[in-house]
Amino acid sequence: MIMKKSAFMLLIILLSLTANAQTPYHNEDGKKIDKEELETKDYLPEIHGTIRTKFEYQTEMAASRFEVRNARISITGNVLPIVAYKAEIDLSDEGQIKMLDAYARLFPIKDLTVTAGQMRVPFTIDAHRSPHQQYFANRSFIAKQVGNVRDVGVTLGYKFGTGIPVTLEGGLYNGSGLTNQKEWHKEVNYSAKAQFLFAKKLNLALSIQSIQPQEVRINSYDIGAFYEFGRFHIEGEYLYKTYADNAYDNVHAVNSFINYDLPLQKVFSKMSFLARYDMMTSQSDGDRKSVV
């Protein structure tokens, strides 16, 4: 099936209710604890959860539906000050149960992290947002289709710089996703990402990925940036994907949006006004027998 998708969405009003967990370390992804030895309370895991439901109406079909888009639960904690862990499962990803993250994270030296297990690979900006961090009810095509990659492997991360903080991430992975972990691989599958933080509010991210999940090697390149000032958040991202031996047409994907937050005093914390341009050309998962 060939899909050519282009969408422009304007949300006039989006009400957002936020709740902040009162935890000592806010350890959502696995962090280092600055202690030589852990106290009893430090061994207690943190539990995080997100439930997201929605109602959709299809004007062309004159039909509607309710859906539980996400019901995520994650557990994070530490077994040593420099050894953290995370396990996350989605009990209802459009009706499907999916194991998302299952990894251990080490902090061997200052500013260096080593993560091994099942995780989201370092690639793109929007795909790395959890459901409670997303700006729109529906994810962009980059986050959902062409850049949404979780895999099993190892990732190294390093932070440096004071004037312009830089975060580098890169790793090696199976390349076949989460369900085919028993397969043996001869090819090298990797992903890398560099983030530059300019003037505290301007973030630039560059990503590259090369995988061979099926019969055809796929090379992807991504550049994105966002700028925050006052109550505004402006973001743009472009992804370019190619296939070895010109097996399929090259893929282009764009996600750009602007967000303005209006603080509220009662019940809800804010009201957000958003506009987005979101598009993707035809793409394939690398299997010569099918195109999506």
Residue spans for each PLM region:
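Intrinsically disordered, low-complexity Ser/Thr- and acidic-rich flexible linkers and loops
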Residues: 25, 29-35, 263-268
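Detector for outer-membrane/organellar transmembrane beta-barrel domains
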Residues: 185, 195-285
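Outer membrane beta-barrel
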Residues: 35-175, 186-188, 195-203, 274, ...
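Outer-membrane beta-barrel and related beta-rich outer-membrane complex signature
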Residues: 99, 126-130, 180-182, 218, ...
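Cleavable N-terminal export/targeting peptides
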Residues: 1-31
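Conserved small/polar residues in nucleotide/adenosyl-binding loops
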Residues: 291
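An N-terminal domain-start capping segment
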Residues: 28-33, 113, 218-219
